[in-house]
Amino acid sequence: ADIVMTQTPASVSAAVGGTVTINCQASQNIDSWLAWYQQKPGQPPKVLIYRTSTLASGVPSRFKGSRSGTEFTLTISDLECADAATYYCQSYYSISSAFGGGTEVVVKG
């Protein structure tokens, strides 16, 4: 069966300096093969985290990825205005790939 990634919430807002948490639930085991992306309007997606918790080059440690079974979490702490974007999870287990529906993060200054 195809992997389905259920991402929640669809939208979240927090103040500068705050913390947001985004969840992705995989419909089946994907081990640690999960990446997180940030996309801003008019720009291609930027990989933030791969293999569940490994930060991509240049990504600050305010971004943290974690896993509990088939549930994956992206936590963004010490929010900055520049963090306002849409975030996506992606499973890339075996030859299968599936994206979550996205979470819009609104940062209130």
UniProtKB/Swiss-Prot annotation:
Lineage, top ranks: Eukaryota, Metazoa, Chordata, Craniata, Vertebrata
Keywords on record: Adaptive immunity, Immunity, Immunoglobulin
Pfam families tied to this protein: V-set
Region (Complementarity-determining-1): 25-35
GO CC annotations on file: immunoglobulin complex
Region (Framework-2): 36-50
Region span, Framework-4: 99-108
Region (Complementarity-determining-3): 90-98
This protein's name: Ig kappa chain V region 3374
Positions of region (Complementarity-determining-2): 51-57
Miscellaneous: This chain was obtained from antibody to type III pneumococci and was isolated from the serum of a single rabbit.
Ranges for region Framework-1: 1-24
An annotated GO BP: adaptive immune response
SMART domains: IG, IGv
Region described as Framework-3: spans on this chain: 58-89
Alphabetical list of Gene3D superfamilies matching this protein: Immunoglobulins
